[in-house]
Design a protein with these regions (language model features):
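Conserved alpha-helical substructure of the radical SAM core
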Residues: 1-22
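Conserved AdoMet/S-adenosylmethionine-binding subsite of the radical SAM
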Residues: 18-19, 30-174, 179-187
Length: 187
C-alpha cells in the first residue's frame, strides 16, 4: 500500500518520454475514487492526458473524478451478465447511464464498452443499446466497443454479428475487440 505522495513518486519515476496517457483501470478504479482523483491531477500537472475505464457503479464517485480525466471508457453490463445480481441491476444501470450523460456533458472523449458472452440475450443487449442512445449519439462519443468474453462462455461469431448489427444503426464505427489481456495471459 502506498500513500498518494509515494504513488505520485512511482508515477514520476516510471514515466517514459513517449508516455502519451496514463490509464486508471483494472478492478474498479471508482472504489478508490479520491486516490484516483489525486493521482489524475498529478498526471495532468505533467501535461499527460488521463484515461479512466470504469463500470460506473456510483455516479457521485464518478463526478468526483471526472474533472481530472480526459478520456472515459464506460463499461456497461447487460442484465443477464453473470457478474451482476439482477436485483441490483436497475441501480447499476441508472448510475452507469448518469455517468455517460455526465461524461458527454463535460465534453470528455467518451467510449462505450459492453462485454458480451454466450449467455447475453439479444433482447437485453438491444434494450441496453436503446437506453445508451437515448443519451449518446454518434456526434458525442468516440467509440463503441463490443467485447466478447474469452475462454469462458465465448459468444459465437453469429451472435457477435447480431450484437454488431444492433449497434450499427446508431453508431457506424462500432468495433468488436477481444479481451486481449486474457489472450496474452496478462494479470
Amino acid at each position: 500500500e502506498y500513500s498518494i505522495n509515494e504513488a505520485c513518486d512511482l508515477i514520476d519515476k516510471n514515466l517514459q518520454k513517449n508516455t502519451y496517457k496514463v490509464n486508471f483501470t483494472g478492478g474498479e478504479p471508482l472504489i478508490q475514487h479520491e486516490a484516483v482523483s489525486e493521482l489524475a491531477k498529478h498526471v495532468k500537472s505533467k501535461g499527460i492526458p488521463t484515461y479512466l475505464e470504469s463500470a460506473c457503479f456510483d455516479s457521485k464517485k464518478f463526478l468526483h473524478v471526472l474533472p481530472s480525466i480526459d478520456f472515459v471508457k464506460i463499461e456497461f453490463k447487460t442484465i443477464d451478465s453473470k457478474f451482476i445480481d439482477a436485483k441490483h441491476y436497475p441501480n447499476l444501470i441508472k448510475n452507469t447511464l448518469e455517468c455517460l450523460k455526465a461524461s458527454i456533458n463535460a465534453n470528455k472523449i467518451t467510449y462505450i464498452k459492453i462485454v458480451v458472452s454466450s449467455n447475453t440475450e439479444f433482447s437485453s443487449f438491444n434494450e441496453l443499446v436503446d437506453k445508451i442512445f437515448k443519451i449518446a449519439s454518434k456526434e458525442n462519443i468516440s467509440g463503441f466497443i463490443i467485447q466478447p468474453t474469452t475462454s469462458i462462455s465465448e459468444p459465437s461469431l453469429e451472435k457477435l454479428i447480431e450484437f454488431y448489427d444492433s449497434v450499427y444503426p446508431y453508431y457506424d464505427q462500432v468495433r468488436i475487440v477481444p479481451q486481449l489481456h486474457k489472450i496474452i495471459n496478462a494479470p
